Amino acid sequence: MYENHHPNTPEVTQEDMNQLFTPFNIGKVQIKNRFCMGPMGISGIQGSLQDWNDVVQEYFLERAKGGFGLITTGVLFTDTEIDYFDPKSMKSPLHNPTVFRRGAERLVERLGAYDTKLFCQASMGVGRTAPGFKTPSSLPIYSIPSMTSTALTTDEVKRKIELMVKTAELYKKSGVHGIELHAVHWGYLLDQFVMAMTNRRTDEYGGTLENRMRVVKEIIEGIHQTCGDDYPISVRLGLKSYVKAFNKASLTGENEAGRTLEEGVEICKMLESYGVKALSVDVGTYDSFYYACPPAYMPKGHGLKLYAKAKEAVNIPILAGSRMGDPWICAKALRDGQADAFVLSRPSLADPEFPKKTELGMPEKIRPCIGCNFGCIGRVEDQGLPPACAVNPRAMRESFYPPRKATT
């Protein structure tokens, strides 16, 4: 029996918690509940062919068994020509479409046993967040500000758009239920096109917000033409940047040099008009990383007031991410109309059974993400190692350490 002992949400009722297990739709795809496993990179655990081997399969399957209604893969890069990612470390489905399709079809079938849907991310690139990659304009590199990037030519931009569309076509042929565009958030390449501070172009892809959004619009139009209007597209969107300048964050959000909330809400409306079926929202960029990947001292649910503004502006689902690993806060946000579903990335690493424990009336049994950023993003960004979790030693190693029956 559910009992609410949460000090911050004493008014959350059993009925509020039950609503987390009602279905919702992304386009024509029905998701069984309001819990979505968020996208996280899986570099380092794929096989030599960059296939979705047993390690990858069991990692995702564990979250399906734990009750997640939607799983969104970590970023899959699409460019194999202009920014050529090493296939040994940065998986692109277009490096070997046959191998990708084989693994994706198997994963979709296995997830289906738990009525879990699969969306795959597709990325145009990382831009200035790492050295050696092209950007909308010549920009200082995030980690090495003394270095500057090379701007993409107009022809290169158009080719990158074509490769995004080609990847979406492969996803649909592989049985993947939908695509999430990565990403108008965190300051990745698409985000750099959309933000005025990183887009100083003078061609059709620069200038006004409409022009800066043109890359995103043309990708969406291409997917509709290739895959049909009913193939659902989600967009990962940062509603506000919290930056003062390159490599300078703004904790309070004052003197915003990146995306303001007002512009973020306007982008939501534009994306809906383009035919996007859901928005997966958060805040922050690499330049304000404590917002993009908030540590323990950032309060849970810190972005909900901003997400509510997006929800008021559009009629498509708002999937709320960033420190949402608290079922009471999720239930209250759903009840109060601040979001439609909840994107749990690090919390799904910490406890794959987060939804199931909530549904069974045992939310206090959830192993919480502690927001340390050490085992997950820290290993990837700082050490170049595969992700892990400080509180769950089986995370991304499920195939090596299968569950065992208790001996007592």
Enumerate the language-model features and the residues they cover.
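Flavin-dependent oxidoreductase catalytic cores
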Residues: 1-408
